[in-house]
From Swiss-Prot:
Catalytic activity: RNA(n) + a ribonucleoside 5'-triphosphate = RNA(n+1) + diphosphate
Example GO molecular function: DNA-directed RNA polymerase activity
SUPFAM superfamilies reported for this sequence: RPB6/omega subunit-like
Protein name as catalogued: DNA-directed RNA polymerase subunit omega
Coiled coil: none
Biological function: Promotes RNA polymerase assembly. Latches the N- and C-terminal regions of the beta' subunit thereby facilitating its interaction with the beta and alpha subunits.
Keyword Cell division: no
Disulfide bonds: none
Membership in a protein family: Belongs to the RNA polymerase subunit omega family.
PANTHER family named in the record: DNA-DIRECTED RNA POLYMERASE SUBUNIT OMEGA
Pfam family name, one: RNA_pol_Rpb6
Organism: Rickettsia bellii (strain OSU 85-389)
Keyword Metal-binding applies: no
Summary of subunit composition and partner proteins: The RNAP catalytic core consists of 2 alpha, 1 beta, 1 beta' and 1 omega subunit. When a sigma factor is associated with the core the holoenzyme is formed, which can initiate transcription.
């Protein structure tokens, strides 16, 4: 059994990097898709070998492989649209778990403490 090499495929796809990308993509497609028209020789080979053989023989359209690869890179269908919400609804939802506490303006418990504005420390401690 002769091994398939990249030199065999270089006549169809001259760039080796593109060859690897297209052959990988086609091999994944072969792996997921069950084909009934495979020959006995292809049935015992692995999908990457089958992909390289078909590319070298010209059985696979390089333009179709390129288009499939480009479509796989598009993210438009994967991005979810942004739905704008009212900000006041968001604030109400965030604080629903807090208990209701009355806060008055009585600061009588702070009368005996003097704070500095710059450091926030007590004068009495110094």
């Amino acid at each position: 059994m002769a091994r398939i090499t990249t030199e065999d495929c270089s006549k169809v796809i001259p760039d080796r990097f593109q060859l690897v990308i297209y052959a990988t993509r086609y091999a994944k497609l072969l792996n997921y898709k069950v084909e009934t028209n495979q020959s006995k020789k292809e049935k015992r080979d692995k999908p990457p070998v089958i992909a390289l053989r078909r590319i070298a023989s010209g059985k696979v359209s390089v333009a179709q492989l390129e288009q499939d690869f480009i479509n796989s890179l598009r993210t438009r269908s994967r991005i979810e649209p942004i739905v704008e919400q009212d900000e006041s609804e968001d604030l109400e939802e965030k604080f629903e778990y807090l208990p209701e506490v009355y806060i008055g303006e009585d600061y009588s418990d702070l009368d005996d403490q003097i704070f500095t504005e710059e450091t926030g420390e007590d004068f009495e401690d110094k």
